């Protein structure tokens, strides 16, 4: 579940992985989606996780940002 944060307003989620190779595949899918949707989250990762923060332009999450986050969730569930 994505968490809403304030100052600055954003949504965040951490994805856990049991293999580093899965992180690389996941990040590749995110890169392609970012280019398609013109949304570029802050991304950090380690040997077993990827964390994403999507900064919101408005006071609430837009449909574009909701769809983007749901697509990322789908990528994660594919692995």
Where would I find each of the regions flagged by the language model?
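Short amphipathic alpha-helix segments
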Residues: 22-33
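Helix N-cap motif at beta-to-alpha junctions
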Residues: 19-20, 58
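Short beta-strand
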Residues: 4, 42-45
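Short, well-ordered beta-strand elements within core beta-sheets of diverse protein domains
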Residues: 10-18
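C-terminal structural segments of small proteins and small subunits
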Residues: 53-79
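Short aromatic-glycine-(Arg/Gly/Cys) micro-motifs in beta-strand/loop hairpins
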Residues: 1-8
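Short arginine-rich
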Residues: 31-40, 77
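Short proline/glycine- and acidic-rich turn/helix-capping motifs at secondary-structure junctions
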Residues: 45-53
